[in-house]
């Protein structure tokens, strides 16, 4: 799964680099524990944002703004937009924003009651990044599947 996300992101970023100016292209990776690198022996080198930085090299500045347990839903149990990582990502004003959020929203505390807000909250998140950088390119990563024996 992570390999597919990386390949898609790398391909899109190379296309974006054709239009890049002389400055380093800033890439903000937004997400939950998958983005953060939770459970990895060394998330600073093994998380997908760290791997993406290695693959893209010096013309890019990739930053990890993942927050373990984060939800996309603003009424979820840990709304991403209420986290420090979100504020830092907005301040970073990425040229490209990769969003991988939504898996924690399937939690029974969130989805049954708030699922109708999912699209609205996604648009609000995207609009926040557009307000920080009107020329930002937004990429939404496909969610990792939940195993069939997972309690959700």
Where are these predicted regions, by residue range?
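Bacterial Sec-dependent N-terminal signal peptides
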Residues: 1-22
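Residue-level detector of functional hotspots within protein domains
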Residues: 6, 13, 82-83, 124
């Amino acid at each position: 799964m992570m390999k597919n996300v990386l390949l898609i992101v790398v391909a899109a970023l190379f296309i974006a680099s054709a239009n890049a100016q002389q400055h380093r292209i800033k890439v903000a990776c937004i997400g939950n524990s998958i983005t953060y690198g939770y459970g990895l022996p060394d998330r600073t080198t093994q998380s997908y944002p760290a791997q993406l930085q290695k693959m893209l090299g010096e013309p890019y500045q990739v930053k990890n703004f993942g927050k373990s347990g984060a939800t996309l839903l603003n009424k979820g149990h840990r709304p991403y937009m209420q986290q420090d990582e979100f504020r830092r990502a907005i301040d970073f004003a990425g040229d490209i924003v990769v969003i991988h959020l939504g898996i924690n929203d399937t939690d029974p505390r969130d989805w049954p009651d708030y699922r109708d807000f999912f699209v609205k909250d996604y648009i609000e998140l995207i609009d926040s990044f557009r307000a920080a950088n009107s020329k930002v390119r937004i990429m939404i990563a496909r969610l990792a599947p939940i195993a069939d024996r997972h309690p959700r």
